[in-house]
């Protein structure tokens, strides 16, 4: 952003050539005042954009220092959030892959269970316990204990 952005400045070329030296000086002073006011307003806007400085009095050097710190903080935070997003995308892809594998296993298990057995409503799970065909293979009883929401855990993936 240059000093001339958002400022309407009249050039000296538009003025009649017969201006006195005093008129030229007054015009130049007015342009300089506009430029300084624009810079002042820009610093106030920057100060109000930095959370630690909002509404406080601060020198221009302090405003620039705090703005620099805030930008660096936001960059680090953005980088961390981007890493979290990437981790969640990888975790989501893994979970989708597991869902597809489980659906495939379930469909192949259903093909095997189509053959008559003595009691097809009871099966054994991987731990050797008896489960009902209707509970989906869960080891916990959802009737006796309310299910507590599980905290989301980060999935650590090793590079392959």
UniProtKB/Swiss-Prot annotation:
Biased amino acid composition, Polar residues: 107-124
KW NAD (keyword) present: no
Chain positions found as N-acetylserine: 2
Transcription is among the record's keywords: yes
Record Gene3D superfamilies: Helix-loop-helix DNA-binding domain
PTM statement from Swiss-Prot or TrEMBL: Phosphorylated.
GO terms of molecular function: DNA binding; DNA-binding transcription factor activity; DNA-binding transcription factor activity, RNA polymerase II-specific; DNA-binding transcription factor binding; DNA-binding transcription repressor activity, RNA polymerase II-specific; E-box binding; identical protein binding; protein dimerization activity
Region (Disordered): 1-40, 105-160
SUPFAM superfamilies: HLH, helix-loop-helix DNA-binding domain
Keywords: Acetylation, Activator, Cell projection, DNA-binding, Nucleus, Phosphoprotein, Repressor, Transcription, Transcription regulation
Example of a GO cellular component annotation carried by this entry: RNA polymerase II transcription regulator complex
First-listed, main subcellular location of the protein, grouped into a coarse class: nucleus
Positions of region (Leucine-zipper): 81-102
Places the protein is found: Nucleus; Cell projection, Dendrite
UniProt modified residues of type Phosphoserine: 2, 11, 107
Residues the record lists as N6-acetyllysine modifications: 66, 153-154
Acidic residues compositional bias, start-end: 1-13
Domain bHLH: 23-74
Compositionally biased region (Basic and acidic residues): 29-40
InterPro entries assigned: bHLH_dom, HLH_DNA-bd_sf
Any GO BP annotation: positive regulation of transcription by RNA polymerase II
Subunit structure: Efficient DNA binding requires dimerization with another bHLH protein. Binds DNA as a heterodimer with MYC or MAD. Part of the E2F6.com-1 complex in G0 phase composed of E2F6, MGA, MAX, TFDP1, CBX3, BAT8, EUHMTASE1, RING1, RNF2, MBLR, L3MBTL2 and YAF2. Component of some MLL1/MLL complex, at least composed of the core components KMT2A/MLL1, ASH2L, HCFC1/HCF1, WDR5 and RBBP5, as well as the facultative components BACC1, CHD8, E2F6, HSP70, INO80C, KANSL1, LAS1L, MAX, MCRS1, MGA, MYST1/MOF, PELP1, PHF20, PRP31, RING2, RUVB1/TIP49A, RUVB2/TIP49B, SENP3, TAF1, TAF4, TAF6, TAF7, TAF9 and TEX10.
PANTHER family (UniProt xref): PROTEIN MAX, PROTEIN MAX MYC-ASSOCIATED FACTOR X
Similarity-based family: Belongs to the MAX family.
Function description: Transcription regulator. Forms a sequence-specific DNA-binding protein complex with MYC or MAD which recognizes the core sequence 5'-CAC[GA]TG-3'. The MYC:MAX complex is a transcriptional activator, whereas the MAD:MAX complex is a repressor. May repress transcription via the recruitment of a chromatin remodeling complex containing H3 'Lys-9' histone methyltransferase activity. Represses MYC transcriptional activity from E-box elements.
Name the record gives this protein: Protein max
Species per Swiss-Prot/TrEMBL record: Rattus norvegicus (Rat)
Gene name in the database record: Max
